[in-house]
Swiss-Prot record:
Domain of life, source organism: Eukaryota
Summary of the knockout phenotype: Plants fail to accumulate significant amounts of the outer antenna subunits of PSI and PSII and to form grana stacks. 2Fe-2S cluster-containing complexes appear to be unaffected.
Species annotation: Arabidopsis thaliana
Name under which the protein is recorded: APO protein 1, chloroplastic
Function comment: Involved in the stable assembly of several 4Fe-4S cluster-containing complexes of chloroplasts. May participate in 4Fe-4S cofactor incorporation into psaA and/or psaB during translation.
Top-level taxonomy: Eukaryota, Viridiplantae, Streptophyta, Embryophyta, Tracheophyta
Similarity comment text for this entry: Belongs to the APO family.
Keyword tags: Chloroplast, Plastid, Repeat, Transit peptide
Comment on protein domains: The APO repeats may provide ligands for 4Fe-4S centers.
Amino acid sequence: MLLVSPACRGVYLQTIDPKPIDFSARASYALCFQIPTSIPKRECLMRLGTVFCFNQKHREQTSFKKRYVSTQNVDLPPILPKNKKKPYPIPFKQIQEEARKDKKLAQMGIEKQLDPPKNGLLVPNLVPVADQVIDNWKLLIKGLAQLLHVVPVFACSECGAVHVANVGHNIRDCNGPTNSQRRGSHSWVKGTINDVLIPVESYHMYDPFGRRIKHETRFEYERIPALVELCIQAGVEIPEYPCRRRTQPIRMMGKRVIDRGGYHKEPEKPQTSSSLSSPLAELDTLGVFERYPPPTPEDIPKIAQETMDAYEKVRLGVTKLMRKFTVKACGYCSEVHVGPWGHSVKLCGEFKHQWRDGKHGWQDALVDEVFPPNYVWHVRDLKGNPLTGNLRRFYGKAPALVEICMHSGARVPQRYKAMMRLDIIVPDSQEADMVA
């Protein structure tokens, strides 16, 4: 037998050379049959022999890791319509297929195989990640509060638009309730830290796998930042917000929990002072301007770079935690719940909430829903002319915190430069009219 390169198709005639054949290490070969050389010359077209290559299946090419190629410009983040449900992060067919498998196993009486943290146990490798997220979250709040004393920030009182400059822009894209009276112009007021770091809160639960939060019992649970609640369930110990640490995994059959280790009552919380100097106040943005004074001009670039690095570390840490821990988000509003399933509080007032009796439409959450970036228009000069609507196609966007840190002297991460469109020269109004 002779090995033949896969380049052959059907029947291939080849003379056999007595010399050794060098085969390529990258190519694939198939087994073929050789006709003996004793065949008479009149019955064979070749003198030494004939090789037949049979049907060979095409081998699938091995997948290689794609190299990151930096693009010149990327599209601006889309604005999702409010009269439609958010798209599912996971394809709906895949969700249905997994549900059918779980239902089939439940009908056969087979328990669902759960890995940490889906079974209520901690993941030891993610505990340091959660600690780093909390530490960088505190540093992020402190640095941003100091930079807001230096960099001017404006927010629209009618919608959620934010602008980083000495004056507000003139782009008429306000979607507030009275935008028709102002012809789409924004109503600018002085911005706060909550306009840059959008507060996303969730209910703190002592046992995420315990009883669900009902509409009547919603006031028995505290509301804390969803990012902090995610870190607490990942292993961060905060005495004011205790969390149950299981030693035995829970057992599920389909969607039903058959063994959760019983219900435990939440222990009494230690009494803490409500002053702004308490350790718990460092996790919240309430009263940050009173806690942190304006920085000196020499420290501004250093604080800006530390704040930028903390922002990237927080986002990276939240991404790692959400790959393992379940976080649910409403498909219609901005409500977020950290836990294996959502709560039953009827406070959704968005699209078609009457049909759902105010209940939330839970689906898997994205990182931008737990830690929203809040994109703003990129301004190259804070003291320059305000942005106009007829030149908006030449403007870029960036997260509000990145824009503030950049104007304070921090280096812009590479992944934001394409969206900011730093390589585009913004023309004058008359030059823009002549552009084809």
